[in-house]
Design a protein with these regions (language model features):
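Short capping loops/turns at secondary-structure boundaries
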Residues: 59-63, 105, 125
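A contiguous pocket-lining binding segment that forms or flanks enzyme active sites
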Residues: 75, 79-122
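N-terminal lobe of the biotin/lipoate ligase/transferase fold
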Residues: 1-64, 68, 158
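Short, structured patches in soluble enzyme cores that scaffold and shape functional sites
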Residues: 48-52, 70, 98, 110-116, ...
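A contiguous catalytic/ligand-binding core that recognizes phosphate-bearing ligands
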Residues: 52-91
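Hydrophobic, Leu/Ile/Phe/Ala-enriched alpha-helical segments that form helix-helix packing faces
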Residues: 26, 70-75, 132, 136, ...
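C-terminal accessory segment of soluble enzyme catalytic cores
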Residues: 88, 107-109, 113-165
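Short aromatic/hydrophobic-glycine micro-motifs
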Residues: 31-32, 79, 141-142
Length: 165
């Protein structure tokens, strides 16, 4: 099953969330799932945007469905993160995860720490992205292609940007 991986680059959380909302709102029922990846000062925010046909039937299952691969990725890097309604490490909430229904899509947003506590060095985005991508592909049976927003998506995203002063 084809899926899309869209890198938004360096954005503040507000802009990242607004972009994900916009992307989700313009997806059809038959759209391919999308993983949106961003970069912030201390985190790598991400959002899984999936038409409802891919998500579990009950909304209360979406979080674990959407974040299991993130927890597996942390563990691949020997970080003992776990999922308990949120991603935790040593009893501390380390992500700001949300679940939403936007248009025809389930949207599960969260983030990875940029610096893993045991190592206290920045984890390269590329290595983390690749590990996460492989975990998502294995879990869901998807095959990601790097993607740019489509024409309609780009127009919608541009409409959300503040005008230059």
């Amino acid at each position: 099953m084809p899926a899309r991986w869209i890198r938004l680059g360096s954005l503040g959380q507000r802009e990242f969330d607004a972009s994900c909302t916009t992307l989700a709102a313009v997806q059809s029922r038959s759209a391919a799932p999308i993983l949106v990846w961003g970069e912030e000062a201390a985190r790598y925010p991400f959002a899984l945007i999936a038409p409802l046909k891919f998500a579990p039937g009950r909304k209360d299952r979406w979080l674990s469905w959407g974040l299991a691969a993130a927890v597996a990725t942390y563990r691949q890097f020997e970080v003992p993160a776990y999922l308990d309604g949120e991603i935790y490490l040593h009893g501390r909430d380390i992500a700001r995860s949300t679940v939403a229904l936007i248009g025809e899509c389930a949207v599960i947003s969260s983030s990875f720490l940029m610096r893993f506590p045991q190592r206290c060095v920045a984890t390269p985005s590329f290595e983390l992205e690749q590990a996460f991508r492989l975990r998502l592909e294995a879990q869901h049976g998807w095959s990601f292609d790097s993607s740019w927003p489509s024409g309609a998506e780009a127009v919608s995203l541009a409409a959300r940007l503040p005008s230059p002063a």
